[in-house]
Each structure stands twice: as C-alpha cells, then as structure tokens.
C-alpha cells in the first residue's frame, strides 16, 4: 500500500491524527508543521517569532523533509482544513512524489487568492486583524481560540473525552500564511484528487465546502472524487473509523472516478 502523509490544519498538530492511526492499514506519517513548539503541549499558545515569518512554502518544505526522513519516496498526501494549502504546495513542488491528494474539509481558495478569501464571511475580518497584529509584532491569536469557540468549531459531534483531547492540545497558528496567495498551477490535472466533505462541519460549513470543491475542479482541473461523511470538522478525532476506510481504499490503489 502507498504510505500516507497526514497534514494537520490550523491550531492543530500531529496529535490530532492519533485516534486515526490505529485504523489505518498503510504506513502513515503524521507531521508537525513549523513552528513545532506550538503543536500541542505547554507552549501551544506561545507567541514565537516564526509566527510572523513562516509561509506556505515553508510548510511544504517541512512536509517533504519529513517524508524524506521517513523514507517515503511516493505517498498519498492528506490535508485537513488549513492543511489543504500545504498539500497543494507540496504537489506543486514535487508532483511525481504525490500519488493522490486528499482534502479533508480543507481550504482550497480560488487560484492565486488567500485562505482568508475562502473562509466563512464572519471569520474574514477577525482573521485579517490577527494577521495585521502578527505583522506588527503583536500577539497572534489565530488558533488560540477560547473554549466556547473550540467546542463550536471543532467538537460539535464529540463526546466529552474527545472534546477534552482537543481543548488540551489546540494552540495558536501562523496567521500570515492565511493572507498569502495560494496557488495550484503546476499540479498535473490528472493527479488523483479526493475531497472529503463533512456534513456537520461548523468550521467550514457544507455549502462552503461545495465552493472549495469547485475551486479545486477549476484549478488544477481534472476529476475530483467527493466523499461525504456525516461528521463535524475534526473527523479524525470524532469518527476515525469512518475516515479510515476512505484513506485505506485510496492507499490500496487508484480510485475509479469518471
């Protein structure tokens, strides 16, 4: 089976994939994007200098470095939420190494536009303010959400134990990457692509995900397989047994999509 490389989204880290790993049949690597010090643990809300400097390109380079270290020459690339920006950039840089792109309720802006422009309208101005604060050397609040926001955005389909897992690990994020233009030009249109649409998602609602799927169909083009799951945003935590069969099938071979 083709190895899986799992890329987390905003405010998350490799920790978010832990409940899923036991359900996977293929070798799997869950990566921590830089800065790694904020990916869970006591420093997850730290305002470190890298938050104002890192780019989507830095994220992609980190993923490729981790894949090299794991000995993965070719792999299925899975991106959750903000991780959609990263996996697209990895595929642009190293298209022959990516066997399949899997976007799990992932952000896919219009070509050359920022993640902010693909967000729900009510989140755009607060996120722009966070980016401005970070560029100005102030505290970076993106991902450092309060408990009420975390429960609403990520935990609406979780039991209390799963919710506690999120609350104890979710941290801050690189806000400036959300304002950076995102590109998919250079990804071969025939590279297999799957979008996992989450129907109960309160972070990226289902109707918004339809727009993101349309963006992916427009660029890089080609067929996009859409799989729907009746879950909230953090499906790998709340319903790992439902996401795993999708990834196991993809890792076992190319999907049959028209």
Region spans (language model):
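Conserved loop-alpha-helix segment in the C-terminal half of the alpha/beta-hydrolase fold
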Residues: 199-230, 245, 249-250
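Gly/Ala-rich beta-loop-alpha elbow adjacent to hydrolase catalytic centers
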Residues: 78-83, 87
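Active-site nucleophile elbow and catalytic-triad environment of alpha/beta-hydrolase enzymes
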Residues: 168-187, 191
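Active-site loop/oxyanion-hole signature of alpha/beta-hydrolase fold enzymes
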Residues: 33-75, 92, 115-118
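Conserved HGGG/HGGXW glycine-rich cap/lid loop of the alpha/beta-hydrolase fold
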Residues: 2-45, 66, 73
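Flexible "cap/lid" loop of the alpha/beta hydrolase fold
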Residues: 92, 97-98, 102-138, 204, ...
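Short beta-strand/loop motif that positions the catalytic acidic residue
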Residues: 195-197
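Short, proline-enriched alpha-helix->beta-strand connector loops that line the catalytic pocket
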Residues: 2, 188-193, 222-224
């Amino acid at each position: 089976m083709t190895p899986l490389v799992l890329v987390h989204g905003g405010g998350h880290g490799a920790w978010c994939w832990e409940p899923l790993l036991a359900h996977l049949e293929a070798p799997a690597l869950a990566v921590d994007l830089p800065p790694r010090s904020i990916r869970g643990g006591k420093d997850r809300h730290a305002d470190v200098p890298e938050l104002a400097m890192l780019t989507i390109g830095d994220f992609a380079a980190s993923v490729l470095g981790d894949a090299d270290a794991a000995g993965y020459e070719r792999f299925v690339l899975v991106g959750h939420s903000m991780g959609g920006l990263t996996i697209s950039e990895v595929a642009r840089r190293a298209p022959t190494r990516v066997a399949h792109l899997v976007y799990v309720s992932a952000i896919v802006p219009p070509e050359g536009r920022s993640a902010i422009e693909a967000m729900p309208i009510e989140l755009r101005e607060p996120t722009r303010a966070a980016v401005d604060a970070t560029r100005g050397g102030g505290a970076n609040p993106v991902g450092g959400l309060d408990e009420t926001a975390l429960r609403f955005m990520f935990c609406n389909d979780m039991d209390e134990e799963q919710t506690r897992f999120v609350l104890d690990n979710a941290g801050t994020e690189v806000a400036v990457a959300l304002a950076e233009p995102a590109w998919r030009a250079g990804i071969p249109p025939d590279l297999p692509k799957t979008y996992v649409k989450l129907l109960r998602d309160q972070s990226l609602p289902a109707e918004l995900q339809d727009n993101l799927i349309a963006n992916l169909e427009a660029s890089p083009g080609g067929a996009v397989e859409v799989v729907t799951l009746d879950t909230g945003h953090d499906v790998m935590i709340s319903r790992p047994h439902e996401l795993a069969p999708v990834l196991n099938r993809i890792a076992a071979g190319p999907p049959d999509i028209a």
